A protein has these predicted regions:
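Non-catalytic C-terminal interaction segments of nucleic acid-processing enzymes
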Residues: 1-3, 14-112
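Conserved catalytic cores of phosphodiester-cleaving nucleases, focusing on short active-site segments
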Residues: 5-11
Length: 112
């Protein structure tokens, strides 16, 4: 069974920075597989914001400009939706994303 929707959750910008730096090849393969299967991808990052990413307000040594460029490039390359939130709301958001994605596909007749 191919996934139709995936939510990639990261606990903060430092974890996401590690994916773009040390684990980039593995992270890239995951996104390429999902994209090849027509999967919609949502990247949910807790305890973060675009402002924190752009301004380098995280512990990682990854350059803020490079980090921002990678995030933007992946949004375009993999048609990825980025969601920033507090950790208290991540469970609810994941549920809503999965529910709304499936509901939209059903209403559009993607399943019979």
């Amino acid at each position: 069974i191919n996934p139709i929707c995936a939510v990639e959750r990261k606990m903060d910008l430092d974890e996401l920075a590690r994916c773009f730096a040390q684990g980039r090849q593995r992270f890239q393969r995951e996104f390429e597989r999902a994209t090849d299967q027509g999967c919609r991808i949502y990247l949910l990052c807790e305890n973060a914001s675009w402002e924190n990413l752009i301004n380098g307000k995280y512990r990682s040594k990854v350059n803020a400009n490079a980090f921002t460029a990678s995030a933007m490039a992946w949004m375009v390359r993999y048609n990825m939706n980025v969601v920033f939130c507090k950790e208290e709301t991540s469970g609810r958001l994941i549920r809503e994303i999965l529910y709304r994605d499936l509901k939209e596909r059903l209403e559009n007749g993607e399943y019979g």
